[in-house]
């Protein structure tokens, strides 16, 4: 069976995502569309507005055949690490083609990735503490490969291409033109809105009828929503009670940020105010949110490394076509394929230990078990 894969967050699923899945299937002439989707937490450093099962269900109803979870250890990362986690998972699923939407589908992404293969991504080129890492990275890209575009989806596509190049058997890259509003912009264009706009409308109880598939309008209205508003008290408690030595063990903690975070938390009444207090030219808001989320979830560097050493494919759902594909490849996959979560998988040394730890807060807030005993949606 011909397969095409996509990496997504679906935060939440909307008409632009339905278009992207249809384009991927059409352009790749694929029988099966495999999606690696962020679990309950997303790259911008916050909980997804709906839990992973709700978002997977929406995707399966609108073009995806299989949805596999991108675990928190890969989902809440900077672009290159996010891309690596998603690309390796798709490759482990036996996917032939990697499709992604971009502002620049005409670009030869594989060629650019080869030019960047020897570019130094740390060291002297990244010692300007008045600029973010992303700004300095763009300068390195421009020097190494003449890259001047900085559109978010172009840069993410480039990260996909670099991760794909590192595979033993790279997938075919299939960039296609995005349609509608830009990444994280607010607004609506041709009945397609950014996920940011959809989240804004949902949280304000405004109608999303024009910008999400019709059958999802009432479905979304019934679901528990998640945001930093619910998580901030947990972050505050962690920062006020944890020892500095504990905070230094958190994944992505660097350069004395534990001092800055603990000094600024007492007076902050919400996440927005806290981020303004700790913001500097060196770090983007997304970088700081990711660190704050890692602190909240007690996501240590050790736990992240352990999870990466034991990769697995946690299937959230599949269609009949997806089931057929899984049955045909399940004995040939390099990674374990998980279709039912047992207690031993969630144990401290289990393959889903970090996912379970992170998801417990979602379960506490929403009252719906996220892992134990859950079977794939069908």
Swiss-Prot record:
It is found in: Cytoplasm. Its EC number is 6.3.4.-. It catalyses: cytidine(34) in elongator tRNA(Met) + acetate + ATP = N(4)-acetylcytidine(34) in elongator tRNA(Met) + AMP + diphosphate. The keyword Transferase does not apply. One of its GO terms (molecular function) is ATP binding. The keyword Chloroplast does not apply. One of its GO terms (biological process) is tRNA modification. ATP binds at residues 7-20, 101, 153, 178. Pfam families: HIGH_NTase1. It comes from the Bacteria. InterPro entries: Rossmann-like_a/b/a_fold (IPR014729), tRNA(Met)_cyd_acetate_ligase (IPR008513). Keywords: ATP-binding, Cytoplasm, Ligase, Nucleotide-binding, RNA-binding, tRNA processing, tRNA-binding. GO terms for cellular component: cytoplasm. Catalyzes the formation of N(4)-acetylcytidine (ac(4)C) at the wobble position of elongator tRNA(Met), using acetate and ATP as substrates. First activates an acetate ion to form acetyladenylate (Ac-AMP) and then transfers the acetyl group to tRNA to form ac(4)C34. Belongs to the TmcAL family. This is tRNA(Met) cytidine acetate ligase. It comes from Lacticaseibacillus paracasei (strain ATCC 334 / BCRC 17002 / CCUG 31169 / CIP 107868 / KCTC 3260 / NRRL B-441).
